[in-house]
């Protein structure tokens, strides 16, 4: 039986090597509360504007030529009307909870949705694309929207608003918006650790600096376009993602647990990121700009370390299919789905469940209270 498992594990690893070309991630941590139908406006936040990867993509990939989509069941199982919106989740994302909390809208729509009216645009959209990253090579692997193009879409967005409200009012609107940036996992999990191209050029330390330099350039681009309140998420414990365990653990079927060497890469990256953001803050503070680091790693790791404390039962496999390798088209209407999504930290082999996203939002809420106080 063990021999059979070893053969199966080798076969799975081969499949996963190919499949990892089609992945991206998210963030996580306890108890879901019902959404309010009418969010109350807090302070003077005008809009929420979102950039990044599948952590914060509500469905932009629905409108581009990529296989990395999820606009079909069982995705959206716990969303309103069980709608598979294109979110890599059974329900809402962290940015949906944030938008509701700050009072601008209940859920953040994808910018590329052709049916969006001007009022939806005004209150905020997401430009994010699942599978994207800060390294220019990363989004080419799955043919998704790169970060510079997301910034170009934002410029286009500004022109649309200017046509509606005029240049001066548009600029004020952008200054009063909250910007959310969340990416980076794909750069390491898909790109550096899976494809040999970057490993031939960069040590892991040099690659971390390379990714951060690209992030810095993007943040500077946002600032030049008028962003004044920007949140930047760090990496989660990537060694705890079910698909990473399946691909890189020698005991993927018999003793599933976090792989520390991968998560250490995330902690080191997060340390460097915080230093870089602090330096940028010093340079921009006199202009009224604020950059906030969002710690994703520790809230997620706390859930994984002590899941029952947060109301979870299953940590190292996703709810969809076997939970070891399914995501995107491998998690589909024919897949097995666990009977209780709220018991699972992950919905598929990469992406957290709605409950995990809500738990993460709760852990980040004090930071958003601080941000709201700065408007």
Curated annotation (Swiss-Prot):
Keywords: Glycoprotein, Hydrolase, Lipid degradation, Lipid metabolism, Secreted, Signal. The active site is at residues 54, 348, 351. The keyword Signal applies. InterPro entries: GDSL, GDSL_lipolytic_enzyme, SGNH_hydro_sf, SGNH_plant_lipase-like. Its EC number is 3.1.1.-. PANTHER family: GDSL ESTERASE/LIPASE EXL3, OS09G0540400 PROTEIN. One of its GO terms (molecular function) is hydrolase activity, acting on ester bonds. SUPFAM superfamilies: SGNH hydrolase (SSF52266). The keyword Ribonucleoprotein does not apply. Pfam families: Lipase_GDSL. Residues 1-28 form the signal peptide. CDD domains: SGNH_plant_lipase_like (cd01837). One of its GO terms (cellular component) is extracellular region. This is GDSL esterase/lipase At5g45960. It is found in: Secreted.
């Amino acid at each position: 039986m063990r021999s059979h498992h070893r053969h199966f594990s080798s076969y799975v690893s081969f499949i996963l090597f190919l499949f990892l070309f089609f992945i991206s991630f998210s963030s996580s941590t306890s108890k879901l509360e019902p959404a309010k139908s009418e969010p109350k406006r807090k302070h003077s936040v005008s809009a929420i504007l979102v950039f990044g990867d599948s952590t914060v993509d509500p469905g932009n990939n629905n409108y581009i030529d990529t296989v990395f989509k999820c606009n079909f069941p069982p995705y959206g199982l716990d969303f309103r009307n069980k709608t598979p919106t294109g979110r890599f989740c059974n329900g809402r994302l962290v940015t949906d909870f944030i938008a509701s909390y700050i009072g601008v809208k209940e859920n953040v729509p994808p910018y590329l949705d052709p049916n969006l009216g001007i009022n939806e645009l005004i209150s905020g959209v997401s430009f994010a694309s699942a599978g994207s990253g800060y390294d220019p090579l990363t989004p080419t692997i799955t043919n998704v929207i790169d970060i510079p193009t997301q910034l170009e879409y934002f410029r286009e967005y500004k022109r649309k608003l200017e046509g509606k409200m005029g240049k001066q009012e548009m600029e004020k609107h952008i200054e009063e918006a909250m910007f959310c940036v969340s990416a980076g996992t794909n750069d390491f999990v898909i790109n550096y650790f899976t494809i040999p191209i970057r490993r031939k050029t960069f040590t892991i330390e040099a690659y971390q600096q390379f990714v951060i330099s690209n992030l810095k350039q993007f943040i500077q681009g946002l600032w030049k376009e008028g962003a004044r309140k920007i949140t930047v998420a760090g990496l989660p414990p990537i060694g705890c993602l079910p698909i990473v365990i399946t691909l890189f653990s020698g005991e993927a079927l018999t003793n599933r647990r976090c792989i520390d060497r991968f998560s250490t890469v995330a902690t080191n990256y997060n340390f460097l990121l915080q230093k870089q953001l602090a330096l940028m803050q010093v340079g921009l503070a006199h202009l009224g700009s604020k950059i906030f680091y969002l710690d994703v790693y520790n809230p997620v790791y706390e859930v994984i370390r002590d899941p029952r404390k947060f109301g979870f039962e299953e940590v190292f496999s996703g709810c969809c299919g076997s939970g070891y390798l399914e995501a995107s088209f491998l998690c589909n209407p024919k897949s097995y789905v666990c009977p209780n999504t709220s018991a699972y930290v992950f919905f598929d082999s990469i992406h957290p469940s709605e409950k995990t996203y809500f738990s993460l939002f709760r852990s980040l809420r004090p930071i958003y209270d601080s941000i709201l106080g700065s408007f």
